[in-house]
């Protein structure tokens, strides 16, 4: 009887896995809704209890997400992000140097802030620089997006995928990654990607004749009304929060708690209002995380993960080629659509 139930659970879990992969690729419905359909379905089918299906809502990584959304909102809403972006003006000497400056700054910012928010801030900054310096703006917009995506792999908080992987490691009792563990690969990847675009990739970027940009992107928002002290508080809170996360083990304070100390300072001092803080929380990212975590839990509990692992071992042999395993992993990881968030 136990074996029959196990086979049933594996079949149901694999069915939802295939469903998630297909729906993530087709995007016929929002990714976050797909993830929650999976979580609810795994509970209704009996694979997971309600507590297991929705425990992601109280996961420490979700708590961390929420706090970082608030800190990031202060960084963007006070205009600090635009001030940082304007630093690129100093490097607007030629096309190659400008691409390097834009991509490195965008990548580093997206390593700690919302990738979408970073790109949204950098686009009008770069359009303004191109207009002033006589550069073709179409050469620089795509590198911004790629840099934001690559920069998300610099730190633990750079991308939801990083947090999902870390949560699954903790769930399996395998420990957790350090704050900059991803950066050991992510930072070199950002540097190499930047150099590629600066010296080779730029030749393949479209050269569309420059035309008058949309008024919404022609200039930055006006932050002159924002008190200077708010900018200082927003910047210092972000820097100190990141520092606390880096030295998590030394100070004995978890990432989530450090982030919430910063978020509370932001709201308590009035840098942004309570309503602005609440609006900054991206529920789509939260729901995507919760649903993905539920699927990961089901893969372990049902034995579906072990089943897939055994199939791969049987196909590749007891001592599979590491390159073959890497190819299988990359194929699996590139099936779902990865969003910049």
Residue ranges with predicted function:
Residues 1-66, 70, 184-310:
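Hydrophobic transmembrane alpha-helices of multi-pass small-molecule transporters
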Residues 33, 40, 44-138, 280-285, ...:
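Membrane-embedded alpha-helical segments and adjacent helix-loop junctions characteristic
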Residues 33-38, 115-122, 142, 154-158, ...:
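Hydrophobic alpha-helical membrane segments of integral membrane proteins
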Residues 166-177, 248-251, 310-317:
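Inter-helical loop and helix-membrane interface segments of multi-pass membrane transporters/permeases
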């Amino acid at each position: 009887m136990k074996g029959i139930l196990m086979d049933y659970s594996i079949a149901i879990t694999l069915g939802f896995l295939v469903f998630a992969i297909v729906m993530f690729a087709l995007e016929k419905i929002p990714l976050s809704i797909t993830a929650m359909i999976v979580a609810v379905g795994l509970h209704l089918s009996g694979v997971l209890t309600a507590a297991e299906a929705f425990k992601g809502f109280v996961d420490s990584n979700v708590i961390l997400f929420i706090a970082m959304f608030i800190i990031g909102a202060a960084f963007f809403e006070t205009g600090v992000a635009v001030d940082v972006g304007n630093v690129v003006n100093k490097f607007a000497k030629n096309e190659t140097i400008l691409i390097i400056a834009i991509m490195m700054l965008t990548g580093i910012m997206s390593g700690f802030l919302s990738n979408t928010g970073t790109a949204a801030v950098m686009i009008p900054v770069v359009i303004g620089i191109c207009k002033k310096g006589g550069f073709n703006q179409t050469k620089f917009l795509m590198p911004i997006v790629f840099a934001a995506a690559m920069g998300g792999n610099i730190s633990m908080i750079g991308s939801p995928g990083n947090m999902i992987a870390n949560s699954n490691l903790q769930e399996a009792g395998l420990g957790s990654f350090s704050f900059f563990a991803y950066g050991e690969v992510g930072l070199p990847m950002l540097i190499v990607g930047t150099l590629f675009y600066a010296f080779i990739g730029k030749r393949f970027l479209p050269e569309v004749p420059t035309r008058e940009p949309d008024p919404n992107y022609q200039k930055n928002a006006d932050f002159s009304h924002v008190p200077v002290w708010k900018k200082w508080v927003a910047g210092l809170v972000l820097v100190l929060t990141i520092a606390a996360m880096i030295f998590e083990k030394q100070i004995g304070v978890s990432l989530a708690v450090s982030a919430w100390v910063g978020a509370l300072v932001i709201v308590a001092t009035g840098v942004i209002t309570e309503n602005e803080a609440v609006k900054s929380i991206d529920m789509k990212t939260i729901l995507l995380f919760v649903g993905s975590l539920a699927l990961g839990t089901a893969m372990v509990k049902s034995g579906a993960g072990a089943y897939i692992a055994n199939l791969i071992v049987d196909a590749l042999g007891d001592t599979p080629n590491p390159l073959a395993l890497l190819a299988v992993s990359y194929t699996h990881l590139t099936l779902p659509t990865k969003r910049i968030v």
